[in-house]
A protein has these predicted regions:
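Surface-exposed amphipathic alpha-helical segments
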Residues: 156-213
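Short histidine-centered catalytic/ligand-binding loop motif
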Residues: 52-60, 72-74, 176-186
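N-terminal "mature-domain start" segment
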Residues: 2-34, 39-41, 48-50, 57, ...
Length: 213
């Protein structure tokens, strides 16, 4: 049984909230994070959860938008062996929208070979590229919440290591080899953490996006 303690977490100064375990620590407490990101990490398991606010990609269709962002992420990170394993259809979040216009949500799940697995691969302040010989196999979960009336694509991305290369720096923190299943260590599986973060995502202050109430 999971021993994770879930709680409502404040994002972007409280303008947004979401719910996920306390074991994910706010990276901004230890180093600077870009203004458009909120980054949380469990260093004991080398798992991370990232919230990003991006300008709306008007040239990307709603259908498969999460897959597009997942593949774009793989290109940015020079990931090898990228496979999109699952993608959702398009659905509306009636409880999340500006002036009655619901958000559009799609999700995708894939696998990548990366030479780093934690939050640093997104921040560009990494441990240092370690090369192809030190790649880890990582599960990546991505949700795209499209807030069209405020011109914003929200990305929620979760990273879960599957296989840690003994040559990677991650091995020093969590050990090399196949990752210990979360349930075996009393933690909620990353898929459930991701689901909670997405389904409990709420905007409290639309002024964050420059929108008038």
């Amino acid at each position: 049984m999971s021993e994770d303690l879930y709680t409502l977490r404040s994002l972007f100064g409280g303008a947004i909230v979401s719910t996920f375990p306390l074991r994910f620590e706010d990276v901004s407490n230890i180093r600077q994070v870009p203004d458009h990101q909120e980054v949380f990490v469990d260093l004991r398991r080398d798992e991370s959860l990232i919230f990003e606010l991006l300008d709306l990609k008007t040239d990307v269709a709603d259908q498969g938008s999460a897959t597009w962002f997942l593949q774009d992420l793989a290109r940015d990170q020079d990931a090898e062996g990228t496979m999109v394993l699952e993608q959702s259809g398009v659905f509306q979040a009636d409880g999340l929208g500006f002036r009655g216009t619901p958000a559009i949500i799609t999700t995708a799940f894939g696998q990548m070979e990366l030479d780093q697995t934690n939050y640093t691969i997104r921040l560009g302040i990494s441990k240092g590229r370690q090369g192809r010989d030190a790649q880890n196999i990582v599960k990546v979960y991505l949700a795209n919440l499209r807030l069209k009336d405020v011109g914003t694509d929200v990305l929620i991305t979760a990273y879960e290591p599957m296989l840690i290369n003994p040559l990677s720096e991650s091995a020093a923190a969590v050990g090399a080899g196949w990752a210990v299943p979360a349930s075996n260590s009393g933690n909620m599986p990353m898929a459930e953490v991701f689901k909670s973060a997405v389904t409990n995502f709420k905007v409290n202050d639309w002024g964050l996006f420059g929108a008038a109430a």
